[in-house]
Amino acid sequence: MKDPSEKDRLRQEAEALLQQWEGRYHAYGLFELFDAHSDGDDIVVSGGKRIPCLRQQQGNSPYLCLSDFLRPLNLSPVSSFQTSDSSTIGIFSTSVSLALETDFDADPYQKMMAQLLADRLAEAAAERMHEQVRKDYWGYAKDEHLSIPEMLVEKFQGIRPAVGYPSLPDTSLNFIIDDLIDIKQIGIRLTESGAMKPHASVSGLMLAHPQARYFSIGKIGEDQLLDYARRRGLPLELCRRFLAANL
């Protein structure tokens, strides 16, 4: 938005709405920490539940997969991708009051503003929860002291890849996350493809490896699609539908 006055006006409107919503609508968060290890391109959490991941096939090496940032089972930390921080994983989800999606239906502009703010609130809840996990619950960054601008440019250790985003593009992985932490506890319901309702919801993983970074899977080949369908235990054509944007 190039016009500073328009930007300021929208900010003022958003802040006024947030003040009106105080006590009426809420953001919710849920997380759990699990012992975990990698098995090829799968993340295996305690109890044996697997989270199949995808690996980059385009561009230059290294061809990354999120499982790279967890230690293989029974392997000591000897490589650059294996440290004492790489045997635990966080699984999380955040959402907002479902009423935010319906209370403003009569006013298209207010509905648009409500949806934009609801999305930001769900993301902000995830950011705040991730900070608390790093510093207190997981505790691998007890001495972290970052300003909000520093947090927004991710100067902290670890990553928080979300389902449906470039490094974890398959939204149907939400079914696995639901099995692990029961996201229904915070009011989230899943569609048949794994999309979340309310729309302003976020789910994903927390990885603490000091070299963990965000990346985009990009396009994958038929060979990886076949392997992924096998690891998911799902029909090939269903996985093809889930990963259409990556084929």
Segment roles from a protein language model:
Residues 4, 57, 72-73, 81-84, ...:
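Surface-exposed loop/turn and secondary-structure junction residues enriched for glycine/proline
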